[in-house]
Amino acid sequence: MNRKTGTTTVGIKVKDGVILAADTQASLDHMVETLNIRKIIPITDRIAITTAGSVGDVQMIARILEAEARYYYFAWGRPMTTKAMANLLSNILNENKWFPYLVQIIIGGYVDEPTIANLDPYGGLIFDNYTATGSGTPFAIAILEEGYKENLGIEEAKELAIKAIKAAGSRDVYTGSKKVQVVTITKEGMQEEFIKL
């Protein structure tokens, strides 16, 4: 059986925070396994990751990052920044490049400032204002490039993220569902919601 799967996740950074969004469909080969999977995983109360790739690998990475964030807080008395966590994850992925974690991850958060980063399975790290991962990336990026402006508000960024996921779902057979998981991270904290399409 061909075990090809897919997804689309997006991240958008604006002045007041970060928006992460993902479809909720899990696929295996050409079959939809479920329409109710969470693809955005909170790591701390201010940092989350999106998942594209091997579920087991991303669950392991999430456990490592959660432990590192707790250790950092106890050792230094302050939370790890999103940039520091992204660099840590980049190092972890690069250390394992000969037996890689089969994932592409967006890490987003608001500790000192809003931050979005995209990481490939080998630890390549790119900080940007917006990004996408998964099989629907070409469709989502087209929407993000057209609609992103640095002065977007949180609600406008959320609408843009949902539009990008919806566009990917209409063209990529491995992206889909009847709802979008959206996580908003601001200096006040993190909020998760599911938006029906």
Curated annotation (Swiss-Prot):
Q: Which residues form a coiled coil?
A: none
Give me the reactions it catalyses.
Cleavage of peptide bonds with very broad specificity
Its GO biological process annotations read: proteasomal protein catabolic process
Asked whether the UniProt record includes Protease among its keywords, one would answer yes
Query: Which CDD domains is this protein grouped with?
Result: proteasome_beta_archeal
Localization recorded for this chain is: Cytoplasm
Which InterPro entries does the entry link to? Ntn_hydrolases_N (IPR029055), Pept_T1A_Psome_bsu_arc (IPR019983), Pept_T1A_subB (IPR000243), Proteasome_bsu_CS (IPR016050), Proteasome_sua/b (IPR001353), Proteasome_suB-type (IPR023333)
The question of whether Protease is a record keyword is answered with: yes
> Which residues of this protein are catalytic?
T7 (nucleophile)
How would you classify this enzyme at the top EC level? hydrolase
Single GO cellular component annotation? cytoplasm
GO molecular-function annotation terms? threonine-type endopeptidase activity
EC number(s) recorded for this UniProt protein: 3.4.25.1
UniProt xrefs under HAMAP family: Proteasome_B_A (MF_02113_A)
Function (record text):
Component of the proteasome core, a large protease complex with broad specificity involved in protein degradation.
Query: Know the name of this protein?
Result: Proteasome subunit beta 1
